[in-house]
Design a protein with these regions (language model features):
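C-terminal peripheral helix-coil segments that are non-catalytic and often amphipathic
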Residues: 2, 92-103, 135-151, 155, ...
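Helix-turn-helix
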Residues: 14, 22-56, 60-64
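Conserved hydrophobic residue
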Residues: 28-29, 124, 154
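Short helix-capping/turn signature of helix-turn-helix
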Residues: 51, 116-123
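Hydrophobic/aromatic residues within well-ordered alpha-helical segments
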Residues: 54, 61, 65, 69, ...
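Hydrophobic alpha-helical connector segments
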Residues: 60, 74-111, 161-165, 196
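Secondary-structure edge/capping motif, primarily at the C-terminal ends of alpha-helices
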Residues: 76, 119, 179-183
Length: 243
């Protein structure tokens, strides 16, 4: 067998990538350095050469998980603040988080499991992810809320915009979390794509957007133009929800 010699940076990245699914499945406290070394195909001595402690490795995972910016978030920055963008970004957020739209299924599953385990431990991974999401997405969301209200398509709400943002995100996230077990734990009626579309309406209605605006800006063609690869419910289903 030919041994491939990796430089320090590549070796560290390999160890992090090997540790990610372990932390996702078992959590930080229950994952041993021996398991990490075996998964990374290195000795524990080499593991400790790159990461002095398991905590140091976990901290690197926190940085690694937020290092790359999702291309979809960069695309979002270029969109004009409007009612249409508010509807489109909500459709994408729910589909991306809850069904894995435009993402690698294995990576998405790992991220969700890391989040759930983080809630049960120190919460640090979840805090960093949420801070990252807020920094990238909330400014556009808030601008869209203001634009929709100015256009007369959004009624004034007693709910703080920040809470509207997080409550919507948490609806989408919980749809994903209840599907983590082999047999989905959420007793929803209908297929996941149908439930995701209903979740979009639930969120947008809660924000205060009118049914007419939701239906108008949920046209399949417009959504696909903004987010290539998105195939939402047929227009007939959207119209039925607006009645």
């Amino acid at each position: 067998m030919v041994s491939i010699r990796l430089d320090g940076g590549e070796r560290r990245k390999g160890i992090v990538e090997a540790a990610l699914p372990l932390f996702a499945r078992k959590g930080f406290a229950r994952t041993t350095t021996r398991e990490i070394a075996e998964a990374a195909q290195v000795s524990e001595a080499l593991l400790f050469k790159h990461f002095a402690t398991k905590v140091a490795l976990y901290e690197e995972i926190l940085r690694f998980g937020c290092r790359d910016v999702d291309p979809a978030l960069e695309r979002l920055q270029a969109l004009e603040a409007s009612t249409a963008t508010l509807v489109h970004m909500t459709h994408f957020m729910v589909r991306h988080v809850a069904t894995g739209l435009l993402s690698d299924p294995a990576e998405q599953d790992t991220k969700h499991r890391l989040m759930v385990n983080s809630f049960l431990e120190d919460g640090e991974f979840a805090r960093i992810v949420f801070d990252n999401i807020f920094a990238w997405v909330y400014p556009k969301f808030a601008a869209c809320i203001a634009a929709a209200e100015a256009a007369g398509e959004l009624r004034t709400s007693p709910i703080a915009p920040e809470n509207c943002f997080w409550l919507g995100q948490h609806v989408a996230a919980m749809l994903a979390y209840v599907r983590l077990p082999r047999g989905a734990a959420g007793p929803y009626r209908g297929a996941i794509d149908e439930v995701a579309t209903q979740a979009v309406w639930f969120i947008l209605r809660g924000i205060g957007l009118s049914d007419a605006a939701i239906a108008r800006h949920s046209e399949p063609g417009a959504l696909a133009a903004t987010w290539p690869g998105m195939t939402p419910e047929p227009r007939a289903a959207l119209v039925a929800m607006a009645r």
